[in-house]
Amino acid sequence: FENILLAVKQKRSILKMLFRKFQSNSSESSFVYQTLNQLSLETLGTKVASTLSHGDKRKLELAMALAMGPKILLLDEPFAGLDQAESSKLIELLKSIKKNMPIFLIEHDMQAVFALADKISVLNEGEIIESGSVEKIRRSKLVQNAYLGGDL
């Protein structure tokens, strides 16, 4: 949350925070608006980041990342601290993003991984113990024993 905390500390609105990066380029400013609209965050533009829900802060982090125009989106534990409703909304949002951009997801919430992934690699103590489709990982006794001690 480094960028969001900066906005909170400085009491900047979200739009001011995003536009700070793009002050001189109107096409980039337009892209910021498009990104906010794509993530259904257009109504948050005038709010201060400290007033947002945890889920909206996660969406804002995505907007900030997407505003940079990446070719791939790297997400590290995006579901940490979210309740079930916020997680579900974020899953749907990421499903729409992954249609246009590859996502590399690092996540412990296997249900979120199963909902989003096409291919999965499971690590245990720094080593890949299984790799493959969602179904292969669901059926893997190695993964079940390493993480759940039973069925996924």
Label the predicted regions:
Residues 113-115:
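A short, surface-exposed alpha-helical micro-motif characterized by mixed small hydrophobic
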Residues 15, 35-56:
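Conserved ABC nucleotide-binding domain
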Residues 88-99:
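Helical segment within the ABC ATPase nucleotide-binding domain
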Residues 73-77:
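Catalytic Walker B motif of ABC-type/P-loop ATPase nucleotide-binding domains
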Residues 131-132:
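ABC ATPase "signature
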Residues 62:
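Hydrophobic anchor residue at the start of the ABC signature
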